[in-house]
Amino acid sequence: MNSTSFSQLENHSVHYNLSEEKPSFFAFENDDCHLPLAVIFTLALAYGAVIILGVSGNLALILIILKQKEMRNVTNILIVNLSFSDLLVAIMCLPFTFVYTLMDHWIFGEIMCKLNPFVQCVSITVSIFSLVLIAVERHQLIINPRGWRPNNRHAYIGIAVIWVLAVASSLPFMIYQVLTDEPFQNVTLDAFKDKLVCFDQFPSDSHRLSYTTLLLVLQYFGPLCFIFICYFKIYIRLKRRNNMMDKMRDSKYRSSESKRINIMLLSIVVAFAVCWLPLTIFNTVFDWNHQIIATCNHNLLFLLCHLTAMISTCVNPIFYGFLNKNFQRDLQFFFNFCDFRSRDDDYETIAMSTMHTDVSKTSLKQASPLAFKKISCVENEKI
């Protein structure tokens, strides 16, 4: 997850090439290192599909939530923030990374050289900590429902803090990212004359390693451990739940409902960890010993790891939105250019959002068993 995966995926040739031990370690100097056209075409299709799904999925999710005023609760506000950051990743990370890795030189100018890795790092940090805040909201909702629970104001404050933290942690890219022709000065190939590369130029290797290690903890291991703990506690609580609503339902329905919720919670954590694990491993190995990765295999291996990580921008809308019946209905209305309308009596809050009901605790106690069962079923759908 380390954000330098994006800058260093841009830098990978440069670090090899500037090595004193192997000054001619350029992948582009060896014709055998070029990827076959069939592989490039397949990767282009895959990247294109992820970009389209990531942009359209997150954009639709944002529009649907913003359109429905009744959906602006804590979780949905955080989901909009998550989708917006994923949208930036899909726009800023995928196309620039793919083109630069294949071409081995930068064609997008000095401003984009600094802005691209900066925006990428900001977006990824925001995405991860949005997942953290959603886990916190869910934890308080299920583990401590009578204690402190975040409201919309808390959500907006949390989002502001996330963006400030993300910008601050990404500033080194704006400071140390440079556009230069230094790696190409001794290259004899005419195709690489007057070409430029974009890479980070830290004061020393120790500075670079310290920063990349910090990002590794900040953007992967730290959030992942925290999210896992939150959802594990939620899983245990849901498994042990034996309240009045559960007793009113038959065991088969209770078992299937509990299983559905637990699988969704587990899938969120697994998707986050699995999507980013290959790139995290690749980036860590590259940071500490880049010579361990064969030059000719570097670009292909990196692109595969990077593509896997970018799939997470498509997974989140599915988990947080499109598995919900209302989003399926509203999405259909969206593509049919219809109004986003829904009746209060059949509208289901987005999965993972704060549960609420118009029925008070007093009326709940006075309700008939049949009515209570119906209310409890609706309540669990809202969980």
Curated annotation (Swiss-Prot):
InterPro entries: GPCR_Rhodpsn, GPCR_Rhodpsn_7TM, NPY1_rcpt, NPY_rcpt. It comes from the Eukaryota. Residues 56-87, 138-154, 233-260, 321-383 are cytoplasmic. SUPFAM superfamilies: Family A G protein-coupled receptor-like. Keywords: Cell membrane, Disulfide bond, G-protein coupled receptor, Glycoprotein, Lipoprotein, Membrane, Palmitate, Phosphoprotein, Receptor, Transducer, Transmembrane, Transmembrane helix. A lipid is attached at residue 338 (S-palmitoyl cysteine). GO terms for molecular function: neuropeptide binding; neuropeptide Y receptor activity. GO terms for cellular component: neuron projection; plasma membrane. The keyword Cell membrane applies. Residues 1-34, 109-116, 176-211, 282-299 are extracellular. Glycans are attached at residues 2, 11, 17. It is found in: Cell membrane. Disulfide bonds join 113-198. The chain crosses the membrane at residues 35-55, 88-108, 117-137, 155-175, 212-232, 261-281, 300-320. It is a multi-pass membrane protein. The modification Phosphoserine is found at residues 368, 376. CDD domains: 7tmA_NPY1R. Receptor for neuropeptide Y and peptide YY. Belongs to the G-protein coupled receptor 1 family. This is Neuropeptide Y receptor type 1. The lineage of its organism: Eukaryota, Metazoa, Chordata, Craniata, Vertebrata. The gene is NPY1R.
